[in-house]
Every structure is written in structure tokens, then in C-alpha cells.
């Protein structure tokens, strides 16, 4: 197969932390030669007034994706906040609409990867690993963030998100903590790694 490697960074963000990580992931993927990257979000199911009352980020510039388009990409990198150790309802609703893709095997052999954010660390890893189950059912090739790629994973000099499962950030109980440069670096490296693997599988 020829042509550019197409990577979709698909996310849901409540307070902007995942949106920030998603942009870093997309930047990393775009750093790989021959890669075309799109940044999109899943539809928001929460009413705008309820979001505003909760202090959530209502306006986000990324266009909204449709479940049907996932098969158009060589890799999809999913980003979701944590809700009780799992993905958000918005992301769940989106994935629940991919049954038609599953029936056709449209995602078999595509690369899938996940990044997340948590308030204080609870569910940081379970959100990613439980998300992987969905990717396995679709026959996707699951890619994480190896220590050999994300060398910041060895650094314990400060509190940070990120693991071999994928990039992440700790937002804090009040959501005021923003992704650090180390967390953003890991996100970029995850994007680059996924794009590299997808290109090799496409070749």
C-alpha cells in the first residue's frame, strides 16, 4: 500500500486537560514523515448549560467525528478522562455505535492507542487497560508507550502522569493542575510511536 499514513486523534474532554494532551499527541504523530493527522472529538451528550454550571469547557475547536469514519484511518489514538476507573459516558456512547464497523471488520489490523487524565491518579491505568478491551474486539493492534520511547517514565523526581499503557495527566481534585511539559512530552512521543508503527504496518 502507498500514500500517507492517516492518523486520527479522537478525544473527549470535560475541562480541557485531554484536549491539551490530544494536541500534543497530534503534534507527535505529525512529526513522522508521510503522516496525515486529524484531531477530532466525540459528540458531547451533556447539555451546554449543565456543562457551564459545572465549569466545564463548552467551546472546543476540534470538529466532531462520526463513528463511521474510523475505518478511514490507519491508526486511531483515543483520549478520555476517567470516570470511576473507566472512560467517560460520551466516549462509551460513541464506541457503542461502532457495531457496524465491527461486523465488517473495518478496524481489523488498524492501530489503536489510548491516553487519559485523572483527578488524583485513581483509575489512571485502569481506564486505559479497560479501553483496550474495545480495541481488541475490533481486531486492532494495540500500541502503548514503551519505556524505550517514553524515557520520562523513568523520572520520578516529580508527580506526573504517564505509564507504559499511555500518556496521562493528573488534573488535581479541583482541576486546576494543567499538563506539565514532561506529560506533554510523553503525549508527543506516544503520537510519534503510534504513527511509526502504523506506517510500518501499512507498508
Swiss-Prot record:
Catalytic activity: a quinone + NADH + H(+) = a quinol + NAD(+); a quinone + NADPH + H(+) = a quinol + NADP(+)
An example Gene Ontology molecular-function term: NADH:ubiquinone reductase (non-electrogenic) activity
Residues given in the record as substrate binding sites: 102
Location of the Flavodoxin-like domain: 7-194
EC number per UniProt: 1.6.5.2
Residues binding FMN: 13-18, 82-84, 117-122, 137
Keywords for the protein's UniProt record, in alphabetical order: Flavoprotein, FMN, NAD, NADP, Nucleotide-binding, Oxidoreductase
Co-factor remark: Binds 1 FMN per monomer.
Cited InterPro entries: Flavodoxin/NO_synth, Flavoprotein-like_sf, Flavoprotein_WrbA-like, FMN_Rdtase-like_dom, NQO
Binding locations of NAD(+): 15
Enzyme class label: oxidoreductase
Cofactor annotation: FMN
One GO CC term on file: membrane
Annotated family: Belongs to the WrbA family.
Protein name (database record): NAD(P)H dehydrogenase (quinone)
Organism of provenance: Parvibaculum lavamentivorans (strain DS-1 / DSM 13023 / NCIMB 13966)
